[in-house]
């Protein structure tokens, strides 16, 4: 093979994030196709792609050169930043490069991102080779300015600290000043004996990618392409040129090419991958292995005492636990993982000791008895047939992986503890990368190309919002996309460009739960990335790469449900303490509680973890779970595979005796499988059952059975043929018929694809059960905790308030004197609305109010509150929201009076604050001489109409709390429905139609599997609710009426709803209140007394009626005197449309009782 003549030493991948288009694998593939022997990827201040690049390079026979580009600051150039490329020549250089990158984030973050100080290179110079940065380097900038003194100073620095390791970089990509710089640099090199090196400053693979790269940079920088202010720093020539192209380009400077090869030869870094490095756990004089055995055996004693309080039963059951524990300990110690278990044990125990709620376990880790004994998990794996080998398989060496759930609000405390224990330099969270996803990339590209918002929005909305959606999938899922793509050239151009950018790395973030603990400093294994303040370090390798690099990952996951349980328990135990009862231990509740399962069977699972979706409620209704094993099955069954395969129907039919239970099939079953499959009525539902079947029928070890399960999941034909043979041989040795064994193997293989990890299902079913139990036994505290968790989502809170009302719980309006930021339960068992759930009121103002209340007692009225609270934190807008929500109802006679007095209260408070500041406020404060004035102010103001009060609640709370808009219509609605309220509805006889009315509280349109549209709305008249279905014909006719907060009158047939257990109506006719009035009302009656009538009133009456003329309803004026009453009928030209607006105007003018509709 001929000697290479050129190697690319400066290349950006998409991990640079500010620029760079290609991913590492395609860059390596292109280099290989060009016959390059080596390649450097030098992303901007990071090594994020190093592990992938290193693997891809070696796989393609290309030597990976490790490097990075930097922005550099030095005192010589003031605030001006220059460029520098740093390559690692050896492993010491790699370590120094890692430290340099980490330091840039930790100490050098500026407006332009991470920066290094040039002086840092002095300490970290060993093993590094520098490329000068071309015209953008410090030498380059100085040359272009003709500042020879500055050039000399810069060169002297590099000659002193990087002899033979500093190269003047030459670039020819057609950008301004490149040639001027190049000639000056070559002259300098000759004069000072400095080596030169050629690069192409690569940003993309092919020159045709230039436009896509320009858009990528414009997206990052926030410009449109045609913006004259947009920086134009790149050229179409910055692609991966071939060796021939580079040789032709630098034919006049051959040494610049030769030096690329020499540098490549000098760069020899070995990155240790595929090993594991655990931190040392303190065990005193004992070995880690012995200490684990000691702690596990002590823990098992405690667990057995809890599980089997009866000593005789404990002695009887003990052998199987001891045997299982010994087996697991042997495997853990042989595989070298005792330290891992001890580390997890310690931070979980610390959490429990310090009031941080911890989940019962999740994932396959719940299958370990050692984990249960160490209190890492809280489910007895023997009771639920959970297998250790599903977690840690001695026949397939891989790191154990405990996913641990913590309370969301306290999770960071645990991470802080771990950092304190092992050293902050040894603990870090893990990076995660945001990429340009299908929907967002359409919007971003459209914006940069300058398309109108509506045009881009139309295309973007055609892309389904499903997780993992791609443009390719969207084209298959949405027929309109390919249609507009072919029909519209602008759409085609936008989508084609979006396809080039889809999946490109856009930004970096923090992994939801991953934490790594190193035996030494994190930077011995990976560089760090930090936020702009140099805090919250994360490894620059993502979760898979960081493990491959040797660091052990621990998942500290935040589970909101644990926070809810914790809040509920705090309220419950506060009440129990007042009653002299011991605190409730949620881990000790019985798993067979009848009240909980009765609630579950009624599908009353709103707010219950994992069980609250409509589909899950439907499954619960059909399954009627009556034991904890059924709850474990619920979690496993409610997935697309089981639901679509018919497995769920079989499971339900077998449970309820509609289908014969067989193990696993009527034709092909074996009695030995009964203990394995009995909990699931003979259905192969769990991965553990697949493993147990292989063990029972064919003598597999559980480790070998886990390998079989994995093989079945991957569906590799050659591996399956091998496993089929092993299964057949084992079955034959056990004396099982060969045909039967193979038929069962086929069934197992079929269901293995749907099988779920029972350990995970059981652990999460336990959390589900705990929330179900709390809802059944402590409904107010539980629902208050759930609403607190959802305070930022008004729509969710509204739904949860509805559920509270359905449960018969009383909810009090927010109250500035008794309320808290969050929802809580008072001594009477009523839920007090959380002040923090009021829209438009932040945490700061509420804290200021509660602080003033704690300091000076309850507020007497509005002036008192304003005087005692810091009005800098509590502005007028916030106070208005609090008044409208009802939070100030105790501070005045009514909300209108409070709103009317607000200006005076704020003014008085301001005067009080000023007087206090100069020491002249009297001890009685602002109120000393004002009570009478306040009373007068209140008395002069009329209360708001009920609808205004309710509208204020709706605006600030998202719902009506103290009343209901339907109240003003009830008398009228009785006329339309014959006096029947929704709570009194009954199923209609066949062919009979009944009428119902109510406020629409929910409305949606769904599409069935057959493509038919169905409208569903829920009516509420405060007595009850009714779900109304509108099938195709009715929906086409009335869909425009299906809006929330509209009063509807609906006629149709009423029947039982098998899903909800309530009633539903199939609609035939739908009217809103205006149409009903036009249809049923016979007149609009206005009653006036002789004392009311004058020219002014009649004139205003005329003005109110005028806009509503041309309707069909006649107006009748009733004139009342002490001795007589007369009816005057207005002429036909004064017939009106009796809208809400007209009725409200007239009632406001004359009086609520003097305006009403007349019916036959």
Swiss-Prot record:
Keyword Nucleotide-binding part of the UniProt annotation: no
Protein name (record): DNA polymerase III subunit alpha
EC number: 2.7.7.7
Organism from which the protein derives: Escherichia coli O6:H1 (strain CFT073 / ATCC 700928 / UPEC)
Main location: cytoplasm
InterPro entries: DNA_pol3_alpha_NTPase_dom, DNA_pol3_alpha_thumb_dom, DNA_pol3_finger, DNA_pol_IIIA_C, DnaE2/DnaE/PolC, DNAPol_HHH, NA-bd_OB-fold, NA-bd_OB_tRNA
GO biological process entries: DNA replication
Superkingdom classification of source: Bacteria
Organism placement in taxonomy: Bacteria, Pseudomonadati, Pseudomonadota, Gammaproteobacteria, Enterobacterales
Gene Ontology cellular component annotations, sorted alphabetically: cytoplasm
Catalysed conversion reaction: DNA(n) + a 2'-deoxyribonucleoside 5'-triphosphate = DNA(n+1) + diphosphate
Any Pfam family: HHH_6
PANTHER family, per database record: DNA POLYMERASE III SUBUNIT ALPHA
Protein role: DNA polymerase III is a complex, multichain enzyme responsible for most of the replicative synthesis in bacteria. This DNA polymerase also exhibits 3' to 5' exonuclease activity. The alpha chain is the DNA polymerase.
Protein's cellular compartments: Cytoplasm
One example GO MF annotation: nucleic acid binding
Keyword annotations from UniProtKB, A to Z: Cytoplasm, DNA replication, DNA-directed DNA polymerase, Nucleotidyltransferase, Transferase
């Amino acid at each position: 093979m001929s000697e290479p003549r050129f190697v690319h030493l400066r290349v950006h991948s998409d991990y640079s994030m500010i620029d760079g288009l290609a991913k590492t694998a395609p860059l390596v593939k292109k280099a290989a196709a060009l016959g390059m022997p080596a390649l450097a990827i030098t992303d901007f201040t990071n090594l994020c792609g190093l592990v992938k690049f290193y693997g891809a390079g070696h796989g393609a026979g290309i030597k990976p050169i490790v490097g990075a580009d930097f922005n550099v600051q030095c005192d010589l150039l003031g605030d001006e930043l220059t460029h520098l490329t740093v390559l690692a020549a050896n492993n010491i250089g790699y370590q120094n490069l890692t430290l340099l990158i980490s330091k840039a984030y930790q100490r050098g973050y500026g407006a332009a991102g991470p920066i290094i100080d040039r002086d840092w290179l002095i300490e970290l110079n060993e093993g590094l080779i520098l490329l000068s940065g071309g015209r953008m380097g410090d030498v380059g900038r100085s040359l272009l300015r003709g500042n020879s003194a500055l050039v000399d100073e810069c060169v002297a620095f590099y000659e002193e600290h990087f002899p033979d390791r500093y190269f003047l970089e030459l670039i020819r990509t057609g950008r301004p000043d490149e040639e001027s710089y190049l000639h000056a640099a070559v002259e300098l090199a000759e004069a000072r004996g400095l080596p030169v090196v050629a690069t192409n400053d690569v940003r993309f693979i092919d020159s045709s990618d230039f436009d896509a790269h320009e858009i990528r940079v414009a997206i990052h920088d926030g410009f449109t392409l045609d913006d004259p202010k947009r920086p134009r720093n790149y050229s179409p020539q910055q692609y991966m040129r071939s060796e021939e192209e580079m040789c032709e380009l630098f034919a006049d400077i051959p040494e610049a090419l030769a030096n690329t090869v020499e540098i490549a030869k000098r760069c020899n870094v070995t990155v240790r991958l595929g090993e594991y490095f655990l931190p040392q756990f303190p065990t005193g004089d004992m070995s880690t292995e012995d200490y684990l055995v000691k702690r596990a055996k002590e823990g098992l004693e405690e667990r057995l005492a809890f599980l089997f309080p009866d000593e005789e039963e404990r002695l009887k059951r003990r052998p199987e636990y001891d045997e299982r524990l010994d087996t697991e300990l042997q495997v853990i110690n042989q595989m070298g993982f005792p330290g891992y278990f001890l580390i997890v044990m310690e931070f979980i125990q610390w959490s429990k000791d310090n009031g941080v709620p911890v989940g019962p376990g999740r994932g396959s880790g719940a299958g370990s008895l050692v984990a249960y004994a160490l209190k890492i998990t809280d489910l007895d794996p023997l009771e639920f047939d959970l297998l250790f080998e599903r977690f840690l398989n001695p026949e397939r060496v891989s790191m154990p992986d405990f996913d641990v759930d913590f309370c969301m609000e306290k999770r960071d405390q645990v991470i802080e503890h771990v950092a304190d224990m092992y050293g902050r330099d040894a603990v870090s969270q893990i990076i995660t990368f945001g990429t340009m996803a299908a929907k967002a990339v359409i919007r971003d590209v459209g914006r940069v190309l300058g398309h109108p918002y509506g045009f881009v929005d139309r295309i973007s909305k055609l892309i389904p919002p499903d997780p993992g959606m791609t443009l390719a999938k969207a084209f298959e899922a949405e027929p309109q996309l390919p249609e507009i793509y072919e029909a519209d050239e602008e759409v085609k151009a936008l989508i084609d460009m979006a396809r080039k950018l889809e999946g490109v790395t856009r930004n970096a973030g923090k992994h939801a739960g991953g934490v790594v603990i190193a035996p030494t400093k994190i930077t011995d294994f990976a560089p760090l990335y930090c936020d702009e303040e140099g805090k919250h370090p994360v490894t620059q390798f993502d979760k898979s790469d960081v493990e491959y690099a040797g660091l052990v990952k621990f998942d500290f996951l935040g589970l909101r449900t644990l926070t809810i349980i914790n809040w509920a328990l705090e309220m419950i135990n506060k009440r129990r303490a007042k009653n002299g009862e011991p605190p409730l231990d949620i881990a000790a509740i019985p798993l067979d509680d009848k009240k909980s399962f009765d609630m579950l069977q009624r599908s009353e699972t709103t707010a219950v973890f994992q069980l609250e979706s409509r589909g899950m409620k439907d499954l619960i209704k059909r399954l009627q779970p009556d034991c904890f094993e059924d709850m474990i099955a619920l979690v496993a069954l409610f997935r697309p595979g089981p639901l679509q395969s018919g497995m769920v129907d079989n499971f339900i039919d077998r449970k309820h005796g509609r289908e014969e239970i067989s193990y696993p099939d009527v034709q092909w079953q074996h009695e030995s499988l009964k203990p394995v499959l009995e909990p699931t009525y003979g259905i192969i539902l769990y991965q553990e059952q697949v493993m147990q079947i292989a063990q029972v029928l064919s003598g597999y070890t559980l480790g070998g059975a886990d390998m079989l399960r994995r093989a079945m999941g991957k569906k590799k034909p050659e591996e399956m043929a091998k496993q089929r043979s092993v299964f057949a041989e084992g079955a034959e040795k056990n004396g099982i018929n060969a045909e039967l064994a193979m038929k069962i193997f086929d069934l197992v293989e079929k269901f293995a694809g749907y099988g779920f990890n029972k350990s995970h299902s059981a652990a999460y079913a336990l959390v589900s059960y705990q929330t179900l139990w709390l809802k059944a036994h402590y409904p107010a505290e539980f629902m208050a905790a759930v609403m607190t968790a959802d305070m930022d989502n008004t729509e969710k809170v509204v739904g949860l308030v509805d559920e509270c009302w359905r449960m018969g719980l009383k909810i009090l309006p927010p109250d500035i004197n008794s309320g808290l930021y969050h929802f809580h339960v008072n001594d009477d068992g009523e839920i007090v609305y959380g002040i923090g759930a009021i829209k438009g009121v932040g945490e700061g103002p509420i804290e200021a109010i509660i602080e003033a209340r704690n300091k000076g007692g309850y507020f007497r009225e509005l002036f008192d509150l304003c005087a005692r609270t810091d009005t800098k934190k509590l502005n007028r807008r916030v106070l208005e929201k609090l008044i409208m929500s009802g939070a100030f109802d105790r501070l005045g006679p009514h909300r209108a009076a409070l709103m009317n007095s607000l200006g005076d209260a704020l003014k008085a408070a301001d005067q009080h604050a000023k007087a206090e500041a100069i020491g002249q406020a009297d001890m009685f404060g602002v109120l000393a001489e004002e009570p009478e004035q306040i009373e007068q102010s209140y008395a002069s103001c009329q209360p708001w109409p009920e609808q205004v009060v309710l509208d204020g609640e709706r605006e600030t709370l998202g719902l009506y709390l103290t009343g209901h808009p339907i109240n003003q219509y009830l008398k009228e609605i009785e006329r339309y429905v014959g006096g029947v309220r929704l709570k009194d509805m009954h199923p209609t006889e066949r062919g009979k139609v009944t009428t119902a009315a109510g406020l629409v509280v929910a409305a949606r349109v769904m599409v069935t599997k057959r493509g038919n549209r169905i409208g569903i709305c829920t009516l509420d008249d405060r007595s009850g609710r009714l779900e109304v279905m509108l099938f195709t014909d009715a929906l086409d006719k009335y869909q425009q009426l299906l809006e929330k907060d509209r009063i509807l009158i609906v006629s149709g047939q009423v029947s039982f709803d098998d899903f909800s257990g309530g009633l539903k109506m199939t609609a035939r006719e739908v009217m809103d209140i205006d149409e009903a009035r036009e249809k049923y009302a016979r007149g609009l009656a206005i009653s006036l007394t002789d004392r009311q009538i004058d020219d002014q009133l009649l004139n205003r009456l005329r003005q109110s009626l005028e806009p509503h003329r041309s309707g069909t309803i006649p107006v009748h004026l009733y004139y009342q005197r002490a001795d007589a009453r007369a009816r005057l009928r207005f002429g036909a030209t004064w017939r009106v449309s009796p809208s809400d607006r007209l009725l409200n105007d007239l009632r406001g003018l004359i009086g609520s009782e003097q305006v009403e509709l007349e019916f036959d």
